[in-house]
């Protein structure tokens, strides 16, 4: 019997099932290792990014510290995103009467501004308004300009203004505030007129005053009519407020002087605001009795009489008509936070709060004014000076004025409660800005 030789076992060789299991295990381990490695790599990248940001932040902080110490920055390139540049403010457009708001603006101080005149160089400024000549010690109030938010308000150009007035009459009509605007206008124009004999002339009277410039055949006039309608105090100015009687439906005695003017500039407000009810009559002053009306009721009647006269007598093709809004008074220092103050006395700086409104302008009267003007057939431009005057508590004549025709004395100045005038304005001063608005509209 032949025996077959025995088979030899090969070392290290495993059964196929074992091999397959081992290979599968190795593959799974490889996958797990790869995922772990990827995770470790991502963490490392995140840490690296954070470190980069920290490094950049530290670099910026060091640079800021160096800059604040007035030292040059290190020569390193900062790894930060560029800052977004702030766009420059939009350029203001040239003044356009229909698109520009004269009430949206602010007062800016400019000590370098050259004054076109002073109360010493212009011989026509009344003593009542000559603050510097009357001894006012400060002058900052002279160097503020009204800037519009969106538009450029042009400077008053006296030569250009005279060209506009060549062969024409401009007449200012109203009360003592309007008289101040007229004087300001005259002084602005006069700054461009030579002081040669016959080049100009001035005639003053209680009712009508006329400044003429011969070369331009231009006439700049003022007519006194504080209520616009007729009253028993038109000529008797010294008559007390309680004794005034208005003829609310009569105006022709005044109106006959306004005809044939090329430009009419009206104002009427402060004389209505005495605190008294307005004694009003219809028909002749000789009639017995009168009716006492609230100021705003009488004001509406008077303005309607004026509006009817304008609509009946003014040709819009040949005459421009303007109406000045309320010139603000400053009678309550509490309005602007000056507790214990005496009205505008010793105020040397404007109120800078945007849109400030105090108690010195009656809104109901303003509404009456706007309503009457809005119903007229004749185009009338309302020059809204109310907001810009609200801020100028510093620019009134205060105690540097006259009262009863006499200059306030040094002794009287020690009693500001009695002698401070916070209605009228120093000239030069705020009325020059009113005339800038007028010039811009012309």
Swiss-Prot record:
Keywords: Disulfide bond, Glycoprotein, Golgi apparatus, Membrane, Signal-anchor, Transferase, Transmembrane, Transmembrane helix
InterPro entries: TBL, TBL_C, TBL_N
Enzyme category, top tier: transferase
Chain segments annotated as coiled-coil in the UniProt record: none
Spans traversing the lipid bilayer: 14-34
Motif range (DXXH motif): 421-424
Record GO terms (molecular function): O-acetyltransferase activity; xylan O-acetyltransferase activity
Pfam family, any one: PC-Esterase
Family as reported in the entry's similarity comment: Belongs to the PC-esterase family. TBL subfamily.
Protein name as it appears in the record: Probable xylan O-acetyltransferase 8
Species assigned in the record: Oryza sativa subsp. japonica
């Amino acid at each position: 019997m032949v025996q077959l030789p025995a088979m030899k076992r090969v070392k290290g060789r495993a059964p196929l099932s074992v091999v397959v299991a081992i290979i599968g295990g190795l593959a799974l381990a490889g996958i797990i290792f790869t995922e772990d490695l990827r995770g470790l790599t991502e963490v490392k990248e995140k840490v690296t990014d954070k470190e980069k940001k920290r490094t950049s932040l530290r670099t910026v902080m060091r640079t800021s510290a160096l800059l604040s110490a007035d030292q040059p920055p290190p020569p390193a390139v900062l790894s930060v995103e560029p800052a977004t540049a702030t766009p420059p403010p939009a350029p203001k457009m040239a003044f356009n009467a229909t698109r520009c708001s004269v009430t949206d603006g602010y007062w800016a101080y400019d000590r370098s501004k050259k004054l076109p005149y002073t109360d010493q160089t212009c011989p026509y400024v009344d003593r009542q308004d000559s603050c510097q000549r009357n001894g006012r010690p400060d002058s900052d109030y002279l160097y503020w300009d009204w800037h519009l938010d969106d538009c450029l308000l042009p400077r008053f150009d006296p030569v250009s203004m005279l060209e506009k007035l060549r062969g024409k009459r401009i007449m200012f009509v109203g009360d003592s505030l309007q008289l101040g605007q007229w004087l300001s206008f005259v002084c602005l124009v006069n700054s461009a007129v030579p002081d040669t004999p016959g080049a100009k002339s001035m005639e003053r009277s209680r009712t009508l005053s006329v400044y003429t410039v011969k070369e331009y055949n231009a006439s700049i006039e003022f007519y006194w009519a504080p209520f616009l309608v007729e009253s028993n105090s038109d000529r008797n100015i010294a008559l007390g407020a309680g004794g005034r009687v208005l003829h609310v439906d009569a105006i022709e005695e005044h109106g006959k002087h306004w005809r044939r003017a090329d430009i009419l500039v009206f104002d009427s407000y402060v004389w209505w605001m005495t605190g008294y009810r307005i004694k009003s009559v219809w028909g002749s002053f000789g009639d017995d009795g009168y009716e006492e009306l609230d100021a705003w009721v009488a004001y509406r009647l008077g303005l309607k009489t004026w509006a009817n006269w304008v609509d009946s007598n003014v040709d819009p093709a040949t005459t421009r008509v303007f109406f000045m809004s309320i010139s603000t008074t400053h009678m309550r220092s509490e309005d602007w936070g000056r507790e214990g103050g005496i009205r505008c006395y010793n105020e040397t700086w404007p109120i800078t709060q945007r849109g400030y409104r105090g108690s010195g302008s009656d809104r109901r009267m303003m509404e009456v004014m706007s309503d009457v003007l809005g119903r007229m057939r004749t185009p009338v431009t309302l020059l809204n000076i109310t907001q810009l005057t609200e801020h100028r508590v510093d620019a009134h004549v205060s105690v540097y004025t006259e009262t009863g025709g006499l200059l306030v004395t040094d002794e009287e100045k020690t009693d500001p409660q009695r002698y401070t005038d916070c209605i009228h304005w120093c000239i030069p001063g705020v009325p020059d800005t009113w005339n800038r608005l007028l010039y811009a509209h012309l």
